[in-house]
């Protein structure tokens, strides 16, 4: 069911509130955000959000009760966006909020459907953080970072938003020399570290849970975040592309740089051949192959590949029963833009 709550795996991943050594006694602590507001966020996005999303909002409310979304802008240059806009009630001030497309709200040029932006940073590089989930009916596997003006690479930065912001803050502290600014950041760092500790969130860049996911990744793809698709004991679910990543990038480069349409058509031949292989793979339930080729072409970024990516990706997502991702990629390819990604902007 799309939008249904992904089940938490047992194993004490959830934050624990009570400071106690007896694990049985420690209770999972929910953030103080009303169920109506939670429903509103999840209905707009058709995705379940993890508890750290709501806990971080409460943390930012403590920093700035008036404008939690901007509580980190002066100090870190970070702003809470995306689903946080709903918690802030920004969608209600927008006149045409009914026609708002949250599938595209803060969806940057290279963001695959698996990526959901929650925090933005430096506009010059289009730095942003987002939850990365392998399937729409699961909770995120980590918080990823991308700088859309630079490339399509997604860098995993912890499995919760506290970790992602802490890692960002630590890097920032190493870069600045202004004493006043250093003290301000250290103050936020202490508060954030304490809040994460009390709630039981890991501040590691790569947690055990993330390393376990790494083992399930069938292929890295151009964005580096990797694809996870179900593969059964007979190895049905994924088959490799006949070209290496380096070769595929070379093929893409030749297509994009072709001097004429005729040359471009010729250069497309290896892609056409791979699409035939994908059809065979789909017939034999190796749906991961089409997902990989489509994702690589999407990540390459050129509009010359939009049509092919638009054929491969929605089909792959639907075959994998990740229907919401199929919907997102179709809408994104139809409105793929390097600017104008804030759907709430006037």
Swiss-Prot record:
**ADP-ribosylserine: residues bearing it:** 97
User: What does the UniProt entry list as the effect of changing residue 283 to H?
Assistant: Promotes auto-ADP-ribosylation of PARP1. Abolished interaction with PARP1
Q: Which GO terms describe its biological process?
A: DNA damage response; DNA repair; DNA repair-dependent chromatin remodeling; double-strand break repair; regulation of protein ADP-ribosylation
Where are the residues of the annotated region Disordered?
1-23
Where PolyADP-ribosyl aspartic acid occurs, the residues are 235
Where does this protein reside within or beyond the cell? Chromosome; Nucleus
Q: Source organism's superkingdom?
A: Eukaryota
Region Interaction with PARP1: which residues?
A: 242-346
Classification via InterPro entries? HPF1 (IPR019361)
Which GO CC annotations does the UniProt entry carry?
A: chromatin; nucleus; site of DNA damage
List residues modified as ADP-ribosyltyrosine.
Answer: 238
Q: What are the positions of the active site?
A: 284
PTM annotation (PolyADP-ribosyl glutamic acid): residues: 240
Q: In which broad location class does this protein mainly occur, judging by the first location in its UniProt entry?
A: nucleus
Q: What keywords tag this UniProt record?
A: Acetylation, ADP-ribosylation, Chromosome, DNA damage, DNA repair, Nucleus
Which Pfam families does the annotation name? HPF1
Residues modified as N6-acetyllysine are: 19, 186, 233
The annotated consequence of residue 307 to S reads: Promotes auto-ADP-ribosylation of PARP1
Q: Cite the GO molecular-function annotations of the record.
A: chromatin binding; histone binding; poly-ADP-D-ribose binding; protein ADP-ribosyltransferase-substrate adaptor activity
Q: Which PANTHER family match?
A: HISTONE PARYLATION FACTOR 1 (PTHR13386:SF2)
Q: How does it assemble?
A: Interacts with PARP1 (via the PARP catalytic domain). Interacts with PARP2 (via the PARP catalytic domain). Interacts with core nucleosomes in a PARP1- and PARP2-dependent manner.
Give the function comment from the record. Cofactor for serine ADP-ribosylation that confers serine specificity on PARP1 and PARP2 and plays a key role in DNA damage response. Initiates the repair of double-strand DNA breaks: recruited to DNA damage sites by PARP1 and PARP2 and switches the amino acid specificity of PARP1 and PARP2 from aspartate or glutamate to serine residues, licensing serine ADP-ribosylation of target proteins. Serine ADP-ribosylation of target proteins, such as histones, promotes decompaction of chromatin and the recruitment of repair factors leading to the reparation of DNA strand breaks.
Per the similarity annotation, which family is this?
A: Belongs to the HPF1 family.
- Please report the name of this protein according to its UniProt entry: Histone PARylation factor 1
